[in-house]
């Protein structure tokens, strides 16, 4: 939030999980905190009784938020409630069609909480509830605002929606060095790969410290070099990985495509890794250079 504000963003910025030590900066940079417990509420009010915040309710995810039985005490603490900018909650399974009954139960409870708050405070509150999957699957409940998260990266919650979205990032690296590995030689930590024949391998300067899971070693995935797939060899290292380029015409310095929007998306890497695209994208290290391309 501070970086966005310092970069010239003037629109409201919601801080979803603030800590008590963050409150001074929240006030200084005019950020809007999520207030989710009485401990956080009381400490924030000790800093400012007028600064706007978003009040979060737990409707079934059982992560953060007040419960419906807390409304009376919230009223006693907040009085007119003029510093409540939004009421909100978070859906726990909006991407799963098999959990529609659960999700509709969350929505109904959120509506009940919102009405109880409005009746108690004698005012109508703005509300937000939906994440990307919620927008796609429960668009009738957008209320006053939505929280598009992974949708901004061009990913939805199923293949049909993904076809209509364009992933916004690619991840590339280069071949740092090429080695000829002889039969019976090993590659990588713990001798994770033993050559049963002669190989040519490429060393790529990206590893699990950058978000490339160690589970993707030993051929679990391949990366594109000069439009050919080079499977991983050996274990993924912290800062490097090795690939088989025996049958690929390439040289040191050639580009290696790790993630792209056509041949190998974050969704596909997530499927190979037995996880989701969220984990792949959020794991990408801040030490990797970002290049922003404007159309």
Where are these regions (language model features)?
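Fold-independent oxyanion-binding glycine-rich loops
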Residues: 18, 36-38, 57-59, 90-91, ...
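C-terminal accessory subdomain/extension
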Residues: 180-295
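Active-site loop/helix belt of alpha/beta enzymes
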Residues: 42, 46-52, 57-174, 181-182, ...
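A structural micro-motif
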Residues: 11, 31, 51, 82, ...
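Electropositive phosphate-/nucleotide-binding environments in soluble metabolic enzymes
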Residues: 20, 35-38, 65-68, 100, ...
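N-terminal active-site wall of soluble small-molecule enzyme domains
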Residues: 1-31, 35-44, 51, 137
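A structural signal for short, hydrophobic beta-strand segments that form beta-sheets
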Residues: 15, 175, 232-233
